[in-house]
């Protein structure tokens, strides 16, 4: 599962728009579209501080957001 897949999963499970997601984590909606799009040129990583913010805001594991696996 890619970073784009994980972010799209969070957005889908929260039943919110990408605009709402971007507002709640404090980044531009364009950046969220870049991260979640299907382009081969999309970013494949995000800064740990953004992953932590997403984890706190939406209740997901920070490690899962960053790497696709949870720390046991």
Q: What is each residue range found by the language model?
A:
Residues 12, 26, 37, 70:
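Residue-level detection of the helix-turn-helix DNA-binding "recognition helix"
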Residues 19, 30, 63:
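Key DNA-contact positions within bacterial/archaeal DNA-binding proteins
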Residues 34, 56, 63-72:
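Short, charged recognition helix plus adjacent turn
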Residues 1-24:
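A short, Lys/Arg-rich alpha-helix, primarily the initiator
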Residues 27-33:
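Short, basic interhelical loop/turn and adjoining N-cap
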Residues 40-56:
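Short, basic-rich loop-to-helix N-cap that marks the start of a DNA-contacting helix
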């Amino acid at each position: 599962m890619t970073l784009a897949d994980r972010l799209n999963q969070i957005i889908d499970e929260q039943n919110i728009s990408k605009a709402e997601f971007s507002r709640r984590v404090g980044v531009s909606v364009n950046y969220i579209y870049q991260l979640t799009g299907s382009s081969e040129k999309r970013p494949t990583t995000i800064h740990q501080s953004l992953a932590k913010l997403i984890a706190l805001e939406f209740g997901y594991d920070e490690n899962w957001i960053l790497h696709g696996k949870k720390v046991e």
